Amino acid sequence: MGNQLQLLPENEEEEEDDMETEDRDGEDVEKPSIINFDTSLPTSHAYLGSDMEEFHGRTLHDEDSVQNLPVLPHVALILIPGQTLPLQLFRPQEVSMFRNLVSQDRTFAVLAHSPDPSGTETKAEFGTTAEIYAFREEQEYGIETVKIKAVGRQRFRVHDIRTQADGIRQAKVQILPERILPDPLCALQFLPRLHTHSPQTKHTQTTPPQKRCSQNYRQKKLHCASMTSWPPWVYSLYDSKTLMSRVKKQLHEWDENLKDESLPTNPTDFSYRVAACLPIDDALRLQLLKIGSAIQRLRCELDIMDRCTSLCCKQCQDTEITSKNEIFSLSLYGPMAAYVNPHGYVHETLTVYKASNLNLIGRPSTLHSWFPGYAWTIAQCRTCSSHMGWKFSAVKKDLSPPRFWGLTRSALLPTIPQGEEGVEGSRLLCL
C-alpha cells in the first residue's frame, strides 16, 4: 500500500492532474444488502506471500512472572491481546533478531508508548507480548527481508529496558494477570435451580435453544437480587453475559451481517476482540490495555461505543471524516485490523461505507492490495492534507460493495458530544 508522501506531485500542473476532490460527499450511499467479498481474504494477509512457514502451539507465560523479551523496534502500535500483527522488516538488525526468535520461543515485546502532545516518544510503561505464528525469509537484490505474522498474547508492565551490544533492546517485563471477578449472586443457595423449565412464550419459541437457555438463566439469576439489599439493575451492570449482550447489540448496529458465532464466547477474549476493533485514539486504547478485568473493560467499551458518534481528522480536529453509522466489517477480524505496506509501515485500517472531506491523490492501484479484487487510492484530509487512508474501488462489476474507504486509526480522533451545558465530554470516559 502506498504512502501519501511518495506520490505527491512535483509541481502545480501535475497536482491539478493528480488531485481529485471527492465531490459526492452529500450523496446518500446505500449500504449493500449483500456482501459477496470473501471476508477471509484480509485475515490471511495473502499479500505477504503464500509460502510462509507456519508454527503451531502457543506460548503463555505465568501471570506475575518476570520475563526478558526482545523489543520490536520502529513500530508505533498499541497491540491488543488476540490482535494479529503483520510485519515486513528490512533492517539487518531486525532480520537477525527475528531469525533467532523463530528458533526459540518466538515471543517478543511490543511496547505501548503513551501519546505525547509534543510528538516526542515517551517512556513505555505497558505493552503486550506477541508470538510469531508464520515466518518467511527472502533475499532480493542482495537485501534480506523477513515477513511475519504474529498475534498478541499477554499484557505486561515494563520494569527496565536495556540496549545490547548488537543494538537490540531487551525489556524486563512483568506479565499482568487477568482478574476474574466472582459472580456476586453465586452464593445464593437456590441459584443452581435456575435452569428449571419455564413456560415458553411466543418470543422464546423463535429463539435458538442455547440462547434461550442463557437468557432465562441470566434473567432468573438477576431476579434473585430481590433477596439482597441491591436491585437487579445494579448487578446487571457487572454481569459479564449482560454486558456482552449489550456490546453485541452495538456491534450489530455497526455491521448487520455480523454473526455471533464468529465472536469469542469467553468474556476476556470477547473484550479484547472489541478493544482491537474500536476506532479510538492511542490515549483511550492505552487506558483499555491497562484494565485487568474483562467486566470493567466491557463497561468502558460500552461507554465508548455509546458516546463516540463520529470520527474527525486527528490533525485539525474540526473536520468530520465519518460517523459510526458508516462502519462495517469486510474482514473476519471485524471492522478494523492491522495491515503492513511494502515499506514496512503498519496501518490499523477501519472500513467504512462513506467518508467526507477527503481528497484523492494519484490513480487507483491494485499493487499489494490488502483487499484482493479492490484498487486503492490515497486519501488526504481536505482541510490539512494529512494522510487519512485510502478509497477502495472494485475492479470487477459484480463485486459488492463496489467501493468503500479504509481509514487509518492513527489519523482519526473520536468525537465526544458536548454535555447538556455545552461542556465538552470527558476524553477518558468511564476510566
UniProtKB/Swiss-Prot annotation:
Effect annotated for changing residue 376 to A: Abolishes thalidomide-binding
Listed GO MF terms: metal ion binding
Residues that bind Zn(2+): 313, 316, 381, 384
Domain CULT intervals: 308-416
Effect of inactivating the gene: Specific defects in fin and otic vesicle development.
Record localization: Cytoplasm; Nucleus
Region (Disordered): 1-36
Keywords attached to this entry: Cytoplasm, Metal-binding, Nucleus, Ubl conjugation pathway, Zinc
Binding-site positions, (S)-thalidomide: 368, 370, 376
Entry GO CC: Cul4A-RING E3 ubiquitin ligase complex; cytoplasm; nucleus; ubiquitin ligase complex
Domain named Lon N-terminal: residues: 69-309
Main location group: cytoplasm
Pfam families per UniProt: LON_substr_bdg (PF02190), Yippee-Mis18 (PF03226)
GO biological process, one term: fin development
Tissue expression remark: Highly expressed in brain, head, vasculature otic vesicles and developing pectoral fins.
Metabolic or biological pathway: Protein modification; protein ubiquitination
Compositionally biased intervals (Acidic residues): 10-28
Secretion signal span: none
Note: Thalidomide is teratogenic in human, chicken and zebrafish, but not in mice. Binding of thalidomide and related drugs changes the substrate specificity of the human DCX (DDB1-CUL4-X-box) E3 protein ligase complex, leading to decreased degradation of endogenous target proteins and increased degradation of other proteins that are not normal substrates. This is probably the underlying cause of the teratogenic activity of thalidomide, possibly due to abnormal regulation of the BMP and FGF8 signaling pathways.
Oligomer status and interactors: Component of a DCX (DDB1-CUL4-X-box) protein ligase complex.
Function comment: Substrate recognition component of a DCX (DDB1-CUL4-X-box) E3 protein ligase complex that mediates the ubiquitination and subsequent proteasomal degradation of target proteins, such as MEIS2. Normal degradation of key regulatory proteins is required for normal limb outgrowth and expression of the fibroblast growth factor FGF8. Maintains presynaptic glutamate release and consequently cognitive functions, such as memory and learning, by negatively regulating large-conductance calcium-activated potassium (BK) channels in excitatory neurons.
Protein name: Protein cereblon
Lineage, top ranks: Eukaryota, Metazoa, Chordata, Craniata, Vertebrata
